[in-house]
Amino acid sequence: MNHKIDRDTYIIPPNFIESGTFFGGMFKARNVIEAGILAFAIGVPVFSLLPLSLTARIIALCLTALPAALVALIGISGESLSSFLLIFIKYLRNRRIIGGNSAEDAVPAAEHGGKHIKKKVHKPDKAPRRSRRSGREDFPAEFDEVRSYEIRQKLRPVKKQKPAKEKKAAKQKKKVSKERKVKRPIRTQEPKPACLNPVADYLPISKIENGIIYTKDHRYVKVVEVVPINFMLRSAQEQRNIIYSFVSYLKISPIKLQIKVLTRRAEINRHLNTVRKEMEQETNEQCLLMQEDYLQFVQQIGSREAITRRFFLIFEYEPWSNTKRSDEEGEAINALQSAVHTATNYLRQCGNEVIVPENWDEFTVDVLYNLLCRNESAVKPLSVRAQEVVAEYLAKGRDSEIDHIPATEFCAPKSIDFTHGHHICIDGLYYAYLLVPSDGYKTQVPAGWLSLIVNAGDGIDMDMFLSRQPKETIIQKVGQQLRINRSKIKDASDTNTDFDDIDGAIRSGYFLKEGLANNEDFYYLNLLITITASNEEDLEWKVSEMKKLLLSQDMNACTCHFREEQAFLSALPLVAMEKKLYERGKRNLLTGGAASCYPFTSYEMCDDNGILLGVNKYNSSLIIVDIFNSAVYKNANMSILGTSGAGKTFTMQLMALRMRRKNIPIFIVAPLKGHEFHRACSNVGGSFIQISPASPHCINVMEIRRVDRSVNELLDGPSIQLSELAAKIQQLHIFFSLLIPDMSHEERQLLDEALVRTYNTKGITHDNASLEDPAQPGQYREMPVLGDLYEILKTSKETMRMAHILNRLVNGSASTFNKQTNVRLDNKYTVLDISSLTGDLLTVGMFVALDFVWDRAKADRTEEKAIFIDECWQLLSGAGAAGVRLAGDFLLEIAKTIRGYGGASIFASQDLADFFDLDGGRFGKGIINNSKTKIILNLEDDEAQRVQEALHLSDAETMEITHFERGHGLISTNNNNIMVEFKASPLEKDLITTDRRELREIVERKRREQSTSAEQQI
């Protein structure tokens, strides 16, 4: 097997502009200056004012000035001492609780360790003109804003200086006129009443209209949801194509992008509600027990293991310089709609779909609600929350405001606690933030490297910010910095510790310069990680584990202590990262490096109306599949491939039991080890039909079965009546080709004539009306059996050979085939066991069972049904025989046409050589190609190579297949491959397990139960 690694590597160069350093790059210049000032400020008074001896003063300096200087030199949490003190003072000024049950302005001191903590009082904005400017001051200037501002200043006429007295008089005059002048706001808005929830006022969101978030600093933000793909299991070539497509999007995307990954416990309430509705319709008590067990199992696994992720692409409107303020809103709406359309088209080339909701406003509010109220949204949908908010407004007597309730009221949490420096608390959930600093990135990364963070686990969210910079300015800065660094390295010795840093900066500069010359764009990347937990201990543990995970990948992360509020606001889907955090974490990269951060890498399969298969091994999401959903899957067929002992029978029965729970008729054809299906069949009230020489069950292969066509006639109207006799004889030719593989063309013709004569003896002709029994209206006549055909074949020398071969089924050991049908297929769970048949009879028996089931499946096109064909290679064995080719065509017919009858065919095979070799692989590959969903279990190396070629799997996927443990597999559907661990409840496991050790445990447990029951009776 070829395991050659041909994955592309992308470069994320170090920042080409770094702050100055001293002492060979050991300390930052700011830290050294602050340490010197602090040491001087402390040392001079200590040394000069204390009336002590020289030794005592030196000791005093070592105890005071030296520690302070060392602290300033090293810094705190990566910040300089002065910067940290400013952050801490700002935190002390702003620490508060917003919202909560108390309406007072201050929280009692006893609740917070004796400290008087004020709640934030929200004041209306007095200067709307200035708010727009001040809101943008926290963010880096875009494009040539600074340069254009300087040019405008230079072009303005220079005013002559007035004398001081004239200036003073002018100021007083201006002040008086200002007081008399009535202020006019730039933007006419209706005065907004205060929200009932203070948190709703606190959030930097003005309103949500037209699917757009209007921020309080007058920006327009759009949020769209993106469906991810299973990127990491794609081949190297597929990954390369996806990255190229993402590069194309980045080149024409908005200047600022925020990609948010929201992780939470799986939302399974809709699936559970579907299960409960199905339980109400179930009449079989044994199936009800299975459904209750399934319900408990899904709740258990959903609360303990299952995780779901949502991916959001967020961008803002970028106004042109010539846009009029009056037209800005309309221009923003059109521009953002165009941006959504562009993202949809380009991301579709990557394999991603952009979800287009019916109501954009409701979708946007729901996103914010799920983000801000994680605990509440898990149990209370947005519609219920909206009703509660309306009820609160009515209770407060604010009936007139019902139609104008701010959108933030529906999504804001009840309270936010900013009183802790290391975390914040929102409605009982604890939040902490990690920032990847500028020097915390790897220089060489593979495509999709962010999947490490995306799939980190429950309670780990990620925000990625990309900001495209003006190319002309960056080229100028890179050239200037290159010249500075080259002059530095001339003066530095190669033994200095900062030599490598300068050399790296020079290499980075040349890399950026070359990339910019090759039409790449320049970006700044920021990564912010949100960690949530239900208590402080879990939060600290998750923060520690996340740091370890990043360190294992040569990455680094720093905490946002005393800046948790700024991190919280930055993590909102508003494309607005706080300036200090932005500067601390920005890392320069080119378009290729930005595309390597492709984050939509965690594919999930979760259909609310489906059946649970297991848990995704890579991201712990639930795999709930509804193969009958024609909007997602082109057909409901499935192929299960695996070596002996890999778990094919277990997987088949697990699916069959869970489909039966959904009231879907199940038919299982078991050519080998049919007894393994008996335990589950009997425990759900199913019908176990055993076809063997020693069994009383019989299926008359010559029976023309009555098919209910009432549904088809209602759908299509009266149809052309085709001869049912001709169709049956066509099927019988396949049967006899399997029974007599060396049948000549002449014998085939004579057999056809004999079959027509046999049916004629019972009064059946090509006229369908002849099938009706005159004595019993509504029923068919008594059908001929093989013995009737045998008698006709004996009458001619030309057909005597066929009669001798048929004699075994008429008068020999397999005479059970020579009886009328005495079984029914009206049970919802039917197993046809033909494992007692051996040799050529096994193939014949398998065809008889399939023919019987196929007639039943074609009855009602509106009814979902599933046919499980275990070890289908048995029907395809003996390559080269004409009969086997007919049998292969019959299987292909089932695979190709069952979709039109509302059904699904699930094929399982372990002998892949026979499966793929017959007729050059036409039948095996035909079945695979007509199965939209494939489940690949453990395979040997040579078999894995066959499957790799047939399914176009990557080397990584093929290697995984050869190392699968029992109960693990790969699901391939809709161009996505998912590694899954199949999960069964204890009750299901007892019914379908074939493991010898587990069977022994079941036997011992039942014996203990019997002995306990016997003792109780005594």
Cite the ranges covered by each PLM segment.
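Short, charged cytosolic
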Residues: M1-N15
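Glycine-rich phosphate-binding loop of nucleotide-binding enzymes
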Residues: S19-F47, I205-E209, Y214, V247, ...
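Hydrophobic alpha-helical transmembrane segments
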Residues: P51-L66, Y633
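Extended, folded cores of ATP/NTP-driven motor/assembly subunits in large transport
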Residues: L61-A68, S77-S82, I87, Y91, ...
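P-loop NTPase motor domains
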Residues: Y202-K207, I212-I213, K222-N230, A236-I255, ...
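A short helix-turn-beta junction within AAA+ P-loop NTPase domains corresponding to the substrate/partner-engaging
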Residues: G685-F688, R922-I936
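H-loop/switch region of ABC-family ATPase nucleotide-binding domains
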Residues: S909
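Conserved P-loop NTPase
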Residues: L951-R1007
